[in-house]
């Protein structure tokens, strides 16, 4: 049997074949459990990244009147739709929007990205001024 560390593709093929054959005793159970747990973590990470990007672009929109270009509007729409698509594909992600730490971390990530651009001098609020539902509202563009 191929070890996961040696050849992940061969290992996965073997594990799938064992599952199909009902040979459960031969499965690499601990590794499979770990990978299943990581699958959920990866989805949460993708969602965090998507929300942080939407927030960053909304911050740019709000704080740079001259920067309210068609390109930025399109970026907001595209990133927002990516976040919504993730929510549709994995509805349980919505519970993360209610978690204060998730939302605060996404906000702080967005603010840090804006500050790293070097174009920002004004301070931002310590917490996000918009609700998750507002951020995901396709008609919302802050003034």
Positions of predicted regions on the chain:
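Surface/interface-facing alpha-helical segments and adjacent flexible terminal/loop regions used
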Residues: 1-143
């Amino acid at each position: 049997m191929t070890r996961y560390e040696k050849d992940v593709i061969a290992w996965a093929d073997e594990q799938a074949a064992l599952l199909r054959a009902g040979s459960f005793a031969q499965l690499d159970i601990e590794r499979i459990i770990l990978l299943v747990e990581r699958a959920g973590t990866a989805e949460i990470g993708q969602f965090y990244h998507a929300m942080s990007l939407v927030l960053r672009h909304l911050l740019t929109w709000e704080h740079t009147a001259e920067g309210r270009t068609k390109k930025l509007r399109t970026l907001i729409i595209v990133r927002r739709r990516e976040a919504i698509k993730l929510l549709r594909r994995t509805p349980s992600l919505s519970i993360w929007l209610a978690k204060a730490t998730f939302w605060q971390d996404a906000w702080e990530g967005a603010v840090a990205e804006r500050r790293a651009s070097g174009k920002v001098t004004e301070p931002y609020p310590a917490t996000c001024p918009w609700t998750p539902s507002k951020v995901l509202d396709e008609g919302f563009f802050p003034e």
